[in-house]
From Swiss-Prot:
One of its GO terms (cellular component) is perinuclear region of cytoplasm. Selectively expressed in cortical and hippocampal neurons with prominent expression in the cell bodies and dendrites. Weakly expressed in rat fad pad ECs (RFPECs). Keywords: Cell junction, Cell membrane, Cell projection, Cytoplasm, Membrane, Phosphoprotein. Functions as a guanine exchange factor (GEF) for RAB26 and thus regulates autophagy of synaptic vesicles in axon terminal of motoneurons. Involved in the control of neuronal cell differentiation. Plays a role in angiogenesis through regulation of endothelial cells chemotaxis. Also affects the migration, adhesion, and matrix/bone degradation in macrophages and osteoclasts. The keyword Membrane applies. This is Pleckstrin homology domain-containing family G member 5. It comes from Rattus norvegicus (Rat).
Length: 1039
């Protein structure tokens, strides 16, 4: 090969490898022979100018011949001369003064256009010269022939246009633009097949280098740096681009080789590393030509990023998934050496037999129930292995590839932690659980060839709460991760291409990324189901106790996670409401000075904790809507109200009704008395202060009666819910050991004995009390015969209602206290009933129905009765457990009497129940109910000692008739309850709780028939009396 007659030069990596890592210079004959072979036909070559040429140096030549004469169309003189062999000589140079001349004003970025192939096959982007005096078809024909595309089967589109271009247009007009190539309708298959056939004929064999290492990666850095400098150095000088790219006026360029008409961005031969290296060098070479157009440069960079991403992903498919980037392996000193060992250890540790029968000898002799138990245990193990492998797919495929792409400058805008949360931490968690808990169970079975014991899992599942704490964060961020992923798939083309490639990987098993991100939540909720399946098929008591303990631990943690998620959602909803409230304009100042001091306090923080409740509880928005409000005698105004758990906000819309401002002070729910009005759809709210005095009255008008009913009911529910939250906080402060959620560390202490673990699941949360619709007004309380389900407090034997005192309820006015007994349970035994007056214990409707309402009774209904102040309970008393709230119906069957009572009169019944037939004078046939109550409880005036012996009972001062003697004075009543501390506590709570929200006291009845006789309730007496009256009436009618 004679370099003196060289006419072509090739800078391709393969050609440089043949020429000692330097450009390959060839004559025309050698070039045609060499580059027509299969492996080298796609190389880009450039023409070498002959000696003494007036042309500028070629972009890829290492030297330039000396100038023979000054050229007028060039901008600057050359700085040296070369000999015929291309060697530079720097001796004897003269520095001549440059002659001023007109600068070149052509835009280099307009002399090429980018050709993008919008086909279903991967074809590299081409940069094609926009030649003058040549049509678009003539310029594109060599490119399409090399790609195997028929020019007549495709359409060319300009940028984002949908109108095909004519191939007769002049190519020069499209310089600096972006052209898209799409197959014509009906010819897609033929075009794709032609491209594939062309690729199969021109694809070279991969070099047998170690592990597919690219050719250029083995070149020493110094040589690569010199080669890149050789390419870039000529490009820094301005040249006549039209002559350089092949204008017809240039001699020797009339019949250029077809491959010299286009400049491919990347080579299609060689390995992926060689392709990427050539692509980067080509992009660097042409960056100087297109730098003057910012928009074109940005678009070119976007296209280049997509090509880089496709090249990277293709390399991952060919040579395997990459490792985690080094900067993230801060926990290892020599991560490169340890990673392979760690991966092999994980693979060996996850080894599992095909069936549990391979572990056990003599499985044919097992009973059917034992086989079912082993299958349930095996399902727990097998699903754990499958889940760990799913997590590894997320970390090794999705996350690791994303981080490596970001190391290469791709997808840097994607936040990996926001997309995957703490999934790597979950993967480490489950690998630890598998190796420390489940592998020992398998190894024991493999060693002993015995059955898999479910109790062996207790060590790990007893610590479930502390071990699985990372799940709290993931479950709370899962929804955000899903939303972030959907937004990226919608807006980011590079991310969409990356996810599509990853989802098609064989490790994904046709699962989507969204399905993979939902696996942790699904696995957490599946543990109780798997353990319960094992429990149902286990007969050994000790094993069942251990499994119940594990189920309890898992369910407590899941309940805790649900609570955290619910509170987070409530906080987000509350933040949305706060953003809609614009200002707090409740008080107006009289002058500027007052406004200055007032401004500091004109704010309302709805995100602050609710007073009197646990800080963990979040204020909830229960109801919102538009109402018409009237305050005093003012005219009605349109308002927008927000009802929260503890307060009611009255606001008014501003401007476009998108935001509101607070116009009235917040109304505390526990200081509100609600009453419905006669006007349909209207209700009244009376705001009380700390002294239980009215400070404001607001009338609200809803658009319909149903909406008014909804506001009233929701307000009652808010009051009940708030009171319950405060009761829970006070009970938690006095009895912290009885809370539903105790500290996970205390419950899951490794040193605690298995026998001390509770075998039951966590108690369900108490039902929220709801005020009955029949108790909206104190004058219209529910009768004893109501069959609706009511919430009540059940007190175990020996327990008392010693929970902290409640504040006086919003509905507890003096008129409401008179009807307090009507809301108590009708099945409460007499010995534990709260103290009520005779009028309170009487049904007005019942007395009037049978004509037994005496004038004295009417006076009793109208006259208020003094309330006996209870004696404070001594502080030395031991704290009592908090009551449990249950739902029970207020209907109970009557206790069986020892002897059948047939046609007994009311007087005989009273004598039988009291047991004093001789000491009491025969009563009148139509005795009032209050007298019946007193005769049943005591035949005469009760002394202090009798009250102490009888324990807590009914206290009926002022209701005795003339024949029973004078009523007990207040001084006589007080000593009688000194020993009855629990009863006093219950009475105090009854008076302090609002009407309709008082829990029902339901102690366990004492055994024995005599106890049943002594503890007949007043409601039972009502029913007995009613039955006897009906029997007597029917008997009289028959006679």
């Amino acid at each position: 090969m004679d370099k003196g007659r060289a006419a072509k030069v090739c800078h391709h990596a393969d050609c440089q490898q043949l020429h000692h890592r330097g450009p390959l210079n060839l004559c025309e004959i050698c070039d045609s022979k060499f580059h027509n072979t299969t492996h080298y036909d796609g190389h880009v070559r450039f023409d070498l100018p002959p000696q003494g040429s007036v042309l500028a140096r070629n972009v890829s030549t290492r030297s330039c011949p000396p100038r023979t004469s000054p050229a007028g169309d060039l901008e600057e003189e050359d700085e040296g001369y070369t000999n015929g062999k291309g060697d530079r000589k720097s001796a004897g140079l003269k520095i001549s003064k440059k002659k001023a001349r007109r600068r070149h004003t052509d835009d280099p970025s307009k002399e090429c256009f980018t050709l993008k192939f919008d086909l279903n096959v991967d074809i590299e982007t081409e940069i094609v010269p926009a030649m003058k005096k040549k049509s678009l078809g003539e310029v594109l024909l060599p490119v399409f022939e090399r790609k195997g595309i028929a020019l007549g089967k495709v359409d060319i589109y300009l940028d984002q246009s949908n109108t095909p271009l004519s191939l007769t247009f002049e190519a020069y007009r499209f310089g600096g633009h972006y052209l898209r190539v799409k197959a014509k309708p009906g010819d897609e298959g033929k075009v794709e097949q032609g491209v594939k056939d062309s690729k199969s004929l021109s694809l070279p064999a991969l070099r047998p280098s170690g592990a597919g290492t690219p050719v250029l990666e083995r070149v020493d850095p110094q040589s690569r740096r010199e080669s890149s400098l050789d390419i870039l150095a000529p490009g820094r000088r301005r040249k006549n681009m039209s002559e350089f790219l092949g204008d017809t006026s240039i001699p020797g360029q009339e019949s250029p080789a077809p491959s010299s008409c286009s400049l491919p961005v990347g080579s299609s031969v060689g390995s992926s590393g060689s392709s990427e290296s050539w692509k980067n060098r080509a992009a660097s070479r042409f960056s100087g030509f297109f730098s003057s157009s910012p928009s074109t440069g940005a678009f070119g960079r976007e296209v280049d990023k997509m090509e880089q991403l496709e090249s990277k992903l293709h390399a991952y498919s060919l040579f395997g998934l990459p490792r985690m980037p080094r900067r993230l392996r801060f926990d290892h000193d020599s991560w490169e050496e340890e990673e392979d060992d760690e991966e092999e250890e994980d693979n060996s540790g996850l080894r599992l037999e095909d069936s549990w029968r391979e572990l056990i000898d003599g499985h044919e002799k097992l009973t059917r129930r034992q086989c079912h138990q082993q299958e349930a245990v095996w399902e727990l193990l097998h699903t754990e292995v499958s889940y760990i492998r799913k997590l590894r797919v997320i970390t090794n495929l999705f996350l690791c590839c994303l981080l490596n792409l970001q190391e290469s400058g791709l997808l840097c805008e994607v936040e990996a932690e926001r997309l995957f949360s703490n999934i790597p931490e979950l993967a480490r968690l489950h690998r630890g659980l598998w190796s420390s808990v489940m592998v020992p169970v398998l190894e024991k079975a493999r060693r002993t060839r015995a059955l898999l014991q479910p109790s062996d899992f207790l060590k790990g599942f007893k610590m479930f709460g502390s071990l699985f704490k990372p799940y709290i964060r993931y479950c709370m961020e899962e929804e955000g991760c899903m939303e972030y992923m959907r937004s990226l798939l919608r807006d980011n083309d590079l991310f969409r291409a990356y996810v599509t490639w990853a989802e098609k990987h064989q490790q994904c098993q046709r699962l989507k990324l969204s399905d993979m991100l939902a696996k942790p939540h699904q696995r957490l909720t599946k543990y109780p189901l798997l353990l319960k399946s094992v429990l149902r098929k286990t007969d050994e008591p000790r094993a069942k106790e251990a499994i119940i303990t594990m189920i309890s631990s898992v369910e407590r943690f899941i309940h805790h996670v649900n609570t955290c998620m619910r509170q987070r959602q409530e906080r987000q909803r509350l933040a949305g409401v706060v953003s809609r409230i614009d200002a707090y304009e409740v008080v107006e100042g009289s002058n500027d000075e007052v406004d200055k001091f007032l401004k500091e306090f004109l704010h309302l923080d709805l995100t602050a904790p609710m007073p009197g409740t646990s800080p963990e509880e979040t204020r909830q928005l229960l109801l919102e809507g538009s109402l018409r409000m009237k305050e005093g005698k003012d005219s009605k105004m349109d308002v927008y109200c927000f009802l929260f758990t503890d307060l009611l906000l009255v606001t008014k819309a501003v401007k476009k009704a998108e935001r509101t401002k607070v116009i009235r002070p917040p109304l505390l729910v526990d200081k509100i008395v609600c009453r419905e009005l006669r006007d349909p759809g209207s209700f009244l709210l009376i705001h009380l202060n700390e002294f239980h005095s009215a400070v404001g009255a607001y009338t609200f008008q809803a658009s319909s009666q149903a909406l008014c009913r909804s506001w009233v009911d929701t307000l009652y529910n808010a009051q009940n819910q708030l009171q319950q939250l405060r009761a829970q906080l006070l009970c938690a402060q006095e009895h912290p050991g009885t809370q539903h959620l105790q500290s996970l560390e205390e419950e899951e202490d490794e040193q605690e004995e298995e026998g001390e673990e509770s075998g039951t699941s966590a108690a369900s949360s108490p039902t929220i009390l709801r005020k009955s619709s029949n108790s909206l007004d104190s004058e219209h309380c529910a009768s004893d015969g109501s069959t609706e389900t009511l919430a009540m407090v059940v007190v175990e034997p020996g327990e008392t209602l010693s929970s902290p005192e409640f504040d006086r309820g919003p509905f507890s006015s003096q008129s409401d206290e008179a009807s307090l007994s009507n809301t108590t349970s009708s099945i409460t035994p007499t010995s534990e009933l709260l103290p009520l007056g005779p009028v309170d214990g009487r049904s007005c409707s019942m007395d009037s129905a049978y004509g037994t309402l005496s004038p004295t009774s009417l006076q009793d209904f109208a006259a208020p009765h003094p309330v006996v102040e209870p004696v404070p309970v001594p502080q030395t008393l031991s704290p009592q457990p908090s009551p449990r709230l249950r739902r029970r119906t207020p209907v109970q069957l009557l206790p069986r009497l020892p002897h059948l009572l047939k046609s007994k009169s009311e007087a005989s019944l009273l004598q039988l129940l009291s047991g004093t037939t001789t000491s009491v004078s025969p009563p009148a046939p139509s005795r009032s109910l209050s007298e019946l109550c007193l005769i049943t409880m005591a035949p005469g005036v009760r002394t202090q000692s009798s009250l102490q012996e009888g324990g807590p009972g009914w206290n009926c001062p002022g209701a005795c008739g003339p024949c029973q003697g004078p009523p007990l004075s207040e001084s006589e009543n007080r000593p009688s309850h000194k020993a009855g501390g629990p009863a006093d506590s219950a009475r105090r709570k009854c008076r302090e709780m609002p009407c309709g929200t008082v829990p029902r006291v339901q102690p366990e009845p004492s055994p024995g028939i005599s106890a049943q006789h002594r503890k007949l309730t007043l409601a039972q007496l009502y029913r007995i009396r009613t039955t006897l009256l009906l029997n007597s009436t029917l008997t009289a009618s028959e006679v």
